[in-house]
């Protein structure tokens, strides 16, 4: 999934003319805090998101010679259609579990981080947690 999409996108980006910065493109993958704090019952999910996180640096190093940057965002608990399908009290409890701000993340906050990553040419090979300092318990 993520690796093959990145591979195909990188091939297309490498064929582009470079910008003044010598850059040809930016790949931003989505990992998850589960890559770092997987819970009981999440082994497969944590492993898949851990794979996304762990391929970020070597992919960035490999694609650097072509002017393609690779980054990943590891979001915490965000307001998504899936979460909004949960009962209100569950949504509130999930939001309250975030140290600060104590609420669900807003997809616009994810988008703002992605835009910053695109604009900041020095960002490369990083996985950025976007989770309000949340660390998931094993449960």
Question: Language-model segments: what does each one mean?
Answer:
Residues 6, 48, 56:
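Active-site helix of classical SDR
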């Amino acid at each position: 999934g993520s690796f093959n999409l990145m591979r195909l996108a990188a091939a297309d980006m490498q064929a582009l003319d470079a910008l003044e910065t010598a850059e040809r493109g930016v790949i931003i993958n989505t990992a998850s805090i589960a890559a770092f704090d997987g819970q009981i019952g999440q082994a497969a999910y944590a492993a898949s998101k851990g794979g996304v996180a762990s391929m970020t640096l070597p992919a960035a190093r490999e694609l650097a010679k072509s002017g393609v940057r690779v980054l990943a965002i590891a979001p915490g608990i965000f307001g998504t259609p899936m979460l909004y399908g949960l009962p209100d009290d569950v949504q509130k409890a999930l939001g309250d579990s975030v140290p600060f701000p104590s609420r669900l993340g807003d997809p616009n906050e994810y988008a703002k981080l992605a835009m910053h990553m695109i604009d900041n040419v020095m960002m490369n090979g990083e996985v950025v947690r976007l989770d309000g300092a949340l660390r998931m318990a094993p449960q």
